[in-house]
Amino acid sequence: MEANGSPGTSGSANDSQHDPGKMFIGGLSWQTSPDSLRDYFSKFGEIRECMVMRDPTTKRSRGFGFVTFADPASVDKVLGQPHHELDSKTIDPKVAFPRRAQPKMVTRTKKIFVGGLSANTVVEDVKQYFEQFGKVEDAMLMFDKTTNRHRGFGFVTFENEDVVEKVCEIHFHEINNKMVECKKAQPKEVMFPPGTRGRARGLPYTMDAFMLGMGMLGYPNFVATYGRGYPGFAPSYGYQFPGFPAAAYGPVAAAAVAAARGSVLNSYSAQPNFGAPASPAGSNPARPGGFPGANSPGPVADLYGPASQDSGVGNYISAASPQPGSGFGHGIAGPLIATAFTNGYH
């Protein structure tokens, strides 16, 4: 994609990538040129750079551009005006933010997520089971504050990272005659890059947590970055425009499509290797492949955020993968508290 700048500008989107005076201008008319864009915004302050993004093949405007003011205070003036119209079309100026580096998945850690625990399993059972692999520093189950019953999942912290590798290589373990799933715990920032939650509030509660955190690991930060209908420009940038309708400039957000198709079931998408229908609470039927149905909601990020829970858990969630059996008897809403194995930290 090309950027056509007005006279006296470089026309490069990278020249001022860290400039607080840079703004993203969306909703431009196809007839709007860099000159007319500059003329309009010059009333708010001196403009150092102005450009309209164009398709490299057709040379037609893509309906958006950038304006960089010499004084960042001019940005506040623009935002202070509730309505902007250029070439008989309402436009939408927003602040342009440099895209943050994507957090990397943790490959070495001492903490694991354990999901699918039976209702009668207690924290001592979990600790005792995993001690056969190595010394356990900490073990905890996540509890529902209202019912005071655990939600079927928790965390175990080992003394040695190599033990985690061994435990997760086995992946499925049997505790109290119930198959449970073990995965490396990931920092919350990895699963929910900055900005994804803020742009997801229009989605259902479970959709927010699942689609933006675990169901779309192949598309991290897909809402927070600049590619929301404007692919291929200024690769070092992310542009945030809260309240800006996604469908106005590009395809409908993938999460909304998934919601329309009903692909989320109890916070888990239906997986080809596991049964999709939800099971009634407490029924815990057998599933294809020999695994009984799980009773826990699994790793949903919102379950680890409340202030009431243990500080050692709040920054971790499990990496995404389906539990053996997608039907869960418990709902996922509701605050959680953690009960921890006493080791000097709790």
Swiss-Prot record:
Q: Which residues carry this modification: Phosphoserine?
A: S6
PTM section of the record: Phosphorylated. Ubiquitinated by the RHOBTB2-CUL3-RBX1 ubiquitin ligase complex.
Looking up PROSITE patterns in the UniProt record yields:
RRM (PS50102)
**What is the top-level taxon of the source organism?**
Eukaryota
Q: What keywords does the record list, in alphabetical order?
A: Acetylation, Cytoplasm, Methylation, Phosphoprotein, Repeat, RNA-binding, Ubl conjugation
Give any Pfam family that matches: RRM_1
Where does the record place the modification N-acetylmethionine? M1
InterPro entries xref list: MSI_RRM2, Nucleotide-bd_a/b_plait_sf, RBD_domain_sf, RRM_dom
Q: Which residues carry this modification: Omega-N-methylarginine?
A: R228, R261
Stated induction or repression of this protein's expression: Up-regulated in astrocytes after brain injury.
A GO MF term: single-stranded RNA binding
Tissue occurrence: Ubiquitous. Expressed in proliferating neural precursor cells.
Q: Name one GO biological process term.
A: stem cell development
Q: Locations of Polar residues compositional bias?
A: 1-15
An example of a Gene Ontology cellular component annotation for this protein is: cytosol
Q: What is its main location?
A: cytoplasm
Low complexity composition-biased segments: 276-289
Stretches the record annotates as Disordered: 1-28, 276-304
Cellular localization per UniProt: Cytoplasm
Record carries keyword Phosphoprotein: yes
Q: Does the keyword Repeat apply?
A: yes
The record places domain RRM at: 21-111, 110-187
Residue ranges of the TM segments? none
Q: Which family does it belong to?
A: Belongs to the Musashi family.
Subunit: Interacts with RHOBTB2; the interaction is necessary for MSI2 ubiquitination and degradation.
Q: Report what the protein is called.
A: RNA-binding protein Musashi homolog 2
Q: Identify the coding gene.
A: Msi2
